[in-house]
Regions:
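Short acidic-glycine-tyrosine-enriched beta hairpin
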Residues: 89-104
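Conserved short histidine dyad/triad with adjacent acidic residue
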Residues: 36-43, 54-70, 104
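Short strand-connecting beta-turns/loops that link adjacent beta-strands
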Residues: 46, 71, 115-116
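Glycine- and acidic-residue-biased ligand/ion/polar-headgroup-sensing regions
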Residues: 71-73, 78-83
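A short, N-terminal "cap"/entry segment at the start of jelly-roll beta-barrel domains
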Residues: 1-50, 65
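Short beta-strand His + acidic residue motifs that chelate non-heme Fe in jelly-roll/DSBH
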Residues: 65-67, 85-86, 102, 108-115
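A short hydrophobic beta-strand segment most commonly corresponding to one strand
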Residues: 55-56, 101, 116-129
Length: 129
């Protein structure tokens, strides 16, 4: 593969992220599963084909849909805000600067009951099962 690296410019992400008025509009609709996901790297962009990287923003009063993956490890690094990670039914408070590791298998989700957006960087790595 000829790719050595790829730069994702932060100004491009900021332009896509939107503002708090989006979260307010969504809260009026009553569905609390709201977040923006920005894909920084898909598996096909890596040499191994096993790495996926992104940034997620969970708006105040909202949550992610939640998911499980039996063939991937996942690491979250929290950039801004506070929230609650739930994995396998166990809740953990998280804040900017925290790192959270999810083993393959358990259902996990992120909730933001606070008044500021929760932003985190995440990476999944496919493992041999």
């Amino acid at each position: 593969m000829d790719k050595i690296g790829k730069i994702i410019k932060s100004e491009d992400l900021q332009a896509l992220a939107g503002g708090s008025s989006f979260a307010a509009l969504l809260r009026e609709e009553g569905d609390q599963i709201r977040r923006d996901v920005f894909m920084l790297m898909n598996p096909e962009d890596s040499v191994s084909g096993r790495i996926q990287v992104g940034i997620t923003i969970v708006y105040p009063g909202c949550t992610t849909k939640g998911h499980t993956h039996g063939d991937r490890e996942e690491v979250y690094y929290f950039l801004n805000g506070r929230g609650i990670m739930t994995a396998d039914g166990q809740e953990t408070e998280v804040k900017a600067g925290d790192t959270y590791y999810v083993t393959p298998g358990p259902y996990h989700t992120t909730r933001n009951p606070y008044d500021k957006p929760l932003e985190f960087f995440w990476i999944t790595i496919k493992i041999e099962v």
